[in-house]
């Protein structure tokens, strides 16, 4: 998944950008995931609010905006800035950790370790490449490319190549490009592909080389340029569209391909389409109706709360039907 979130270009873009920056600080520096989730949820709700917010009190009427966040919104609206953020930006350690986590392959713990060793910038990383693992070296190599959002038009071209090449390998493959792209976003951080085949189910005693065959085909046509990691069921790598006739080169992009058992495929498609908040709301509704949902299965809960056997699922619609929830098209799941 991409580390770069799209900058907010809504009526309340200043507020949502502030909240996203606070969220990233809590995740990368403080490692307070509950605060990260709270800021993310508030930013998501405010991004869809159709009016310009004039006060913290107005924002507080929205679900997910509590007293503390409302107070920060008041301060931001009154002064155009936030003391807490100013302090974070001025703190060399915090800002360096936050920056280094933007490099693919560098998480908060690795970033803190690098900063403790005096490695704080891209230049520092380049001078200390011997301390980087393979994933981090690729992240550093393509840092500028990975920072760029992928326009939808480019994502559509990438999707065409991936789906066409997969069908060349075997017409029985089923593949879906998920993430914010499937929800209709104008730009994406990376490409997230889910793959399945009738020959692979959760009952399969061994995993056939279904994923490797697809990756090899995409390498053969020079779409996949680098491999970050490759297992039996998940590939993480780098891809690039072919150059234009005028010689213009497209940026390198992150791509993940996951192979999922056929009987678990649509639970996976639902989960990886998102959004995070939509998934949480759907799981909560499922529990109220006596079901538990995750990225693999939907299962009924018995009277003791123990989950039963997975239910058969042949489409996303089936999952909505089981929990008696109105079907939502992917474009309507960005809450």
Curated annotation (Swiss-Prot):
Please tell me where K(+) 2 binds in this chain.
101, 103, 106
Q: Which GO terms describe its biological process?
A: apoptotic process; base-excision repair; base-excision repair, gap-filling; DNA damage response; DNA replication; homeostasis of number of cells; immunoglobulin heavy chain V-D-J recombination; in utero embryonic development
Pfam families xrefs:
DNA_pol_B_palm (PF14792), DNA_pol_B_thumb (PF14791), DNA_pol_lambd_f (PF10391), HHH_8 (PF14716)
Q: Which EC numbers characterise this protein's activity in its record? A: 2.7.7.7, 4.2.99.-, 4.2.99.18
Where on this chain does a 2'-deoxyribonucleoside 5'-triphosphate bind? 149, 180, 183, 189-190
GO MF entry, a single one: 5'-deoxyribose-5-phosphate lyase activity
Instruction: Report the residues modified as N6-acetyllysine.
Output: 72
User: What reactions does this protein catalyze?
Assistant: DNA(n) + a 2'-deoxyribonucleoside 5'-triphosphate = DNA(n+1) + diphosphate; a 5'-end 2'-deoxyribose-2'-deoxyribonucleotide-DNA = (2E,4S)-4-hydroxypenten-2-al-5-phosphate + a 5'-end 5'-phospho-2'-deoxyribonucleoside-DNA + H(+); 2'-deoxyribonucleotide-(2'-deoxyribose 5'-phosphate)-2'-deoxyribonucleotide-DNA = a 3'-end 2'-deoxyribonucleotide-(2,3-dehydro-2,3-deoxyribose 5'-phosphate)-DNA + a 5'-end 5'-phospho-2'-deoxyribonucleoside-DNA + H(+)
Residues where Mg(2+) 1 binds: 190, 192
User: For Mg(2+) 2, which residues are the binding ones?
Assistant: 190, 192, 256
Quote the record's binding site residues for Na(+) 2.
101, 103, 106
This one is known as DNA polymerase beta
Q: State the organism of origin.
A: Mus musculus (Mouse)
